Swiss-Prot record:
Binds 1 zinc ion per subunit. Pathway: Cofactor degradation; L-ascorbate degradation; D-xylulose 5-phosphate from L-ascorbate: step 4/4. The keyword Isomerase applies. Transmembrane segments: none annotated. Catalyzes the isomerization of L-ribulose 5-phosphate to D-xylulose 5-phosphate. Is involved in the anaerobic L-ascorbate utilization. Substrate binds at G26, N27, S43, G44, S72, S73. Its cofactor is Zn(2+). InterPro entries: Aldolase_class_II_sugar_metab, Aldolase_II/adducin_N, Aldolase_II/adducin_N_sf, UlaF. This is L-ribulose-5-phosphate 4-epimerase UlaF. The gene is ulaF. The lineage of its organism: Bacteria, Pseudomonadati, Pseudomonadota, Gammaproteobacteria, Enterobacterales.
Amino acid sequence: MQKLKQQVFEANMELPRYGLATFTWGNVSAIDRERGLVVIKPSGVAYETMKAADMVVVDMSGKVVEGEYRPSSDTATHLELYRRYPSLGGIVHTHSTHATAWAQAGLAIPALGTTHADYFFGDIPCTRGLSEEEVQGEYELNTGKVIIETLGNAEPLHTPGIVVYQHGPFAWGKDAHDAVHNAVVMEEVAKMAWIARSINPQLNHIDSFLMNKHFMRKHGPNAYYGQK
């Protein structure tokens, strides 16, 4: 688990580096599916003092199996997503400014251009709000459930992120670093969409044929972007 703990530590340290986290906000996790264990950031520990050894290992029920600290308060959300979507290898939650603004507005981040289409196949959805009963009950677990409710049976790696109404963004990927990469992109396209709609409030979505081209050339069966 030491290698995975190091990877998760490095991915968490990318959050303040890319301007996605202030103070102790944000958390990254990764899963070892063979062992059924998840490594996640400890709750409330400052990035300035955090070490790889501080990462917390939990089983799929949330029980701590390794680590001196309590795991992130969002652990139950991460675990629910891992249970539902086997393709996920890493998950990140932030309160990055522009993506969170769309979450607070209760709006999906619209697909307006090719930067968005390179990573997200369509709008980045916004969940419904949680009921008072859902918040007062198992809040973090129910946050995971409302994300799953919104995504349904869609392949999560085709839209590797979501904004939770009145809360903030979650992103995911093949591993922890990929999840952070997608979170960075989500913040950038959220900012671009806000600026573009400010310039032209009547702006429509990207043409579907252009979106399809950009997404498929990176992620489709005949993808040709980048090096083999």
